[in-house]
């Protein structure tokens, strides 16, 4: 573990990823409650999948559509799946393209800072823009490589940051 409180498992690196169909629940929430909201939405999505007898095709994720650390965040908790959706759990797509990736354990803020610095240091840029309400991302995800259904201790999760590049 580094002095920043983050345990780097792999990366940073660039990888080309294919488009991925998803199911997810999307909400606008305050930054200060985002992680509690993520946990609530994750529990809701897991319960929905169980009730509908759907086994995900891949890991769960948190997608940040819009980031405003002083205001509201547009977030989505989802999972890779091509199953039928409803009005609450909606279909979506993680776009294909070149992604900057970093796999880590423990704390997300230093991991995000590390990946963003690495992207800049490589002369790359994240596919985002100022929307007037915050920074809007083409795709910025935390992918939970550890299944939250089997490991409840979040500090033990291996998380992959995946930021779509321009």
What do these predicted regions represent?
Residues 1-166:
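A solvent-exposed interaction/effector surface
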């Amino acid at each position: 573990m580094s002095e920043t409180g983050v345990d780097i498992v792999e990366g940073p690196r660039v990888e080309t990823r294919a488009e991925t169909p998803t199911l997810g629940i999307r909400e606008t929430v305050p930054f200060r409650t985002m992680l509690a909201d993520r946990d609530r939405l994750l529990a809701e999505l897991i319960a929905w999948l169980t009730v509908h007898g759907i086994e995900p095709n891949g890991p769960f994720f948190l997608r940040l559509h819009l980031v405003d650390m002083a205001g509201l965040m547009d977030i989505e908790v989802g999972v890779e799946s091509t199953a039928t959706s409803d009005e609450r759990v909606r279909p979506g797509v993680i776009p294909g393209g070149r992604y900057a990736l970093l796999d880590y354990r423990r704390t997300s803020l230093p991991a995000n800072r590390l990946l963003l610095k690495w992207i800049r240091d490589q002369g790359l840029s994240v596919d985002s823009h100022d929307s007037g309400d915050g920074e809007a991302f083409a795709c910025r995800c935390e992918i939970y490589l550890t299944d939250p259904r089997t490991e409840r201790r979040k500090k033990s999760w291996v998380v992959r940051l995946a930021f779509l590049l321009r």
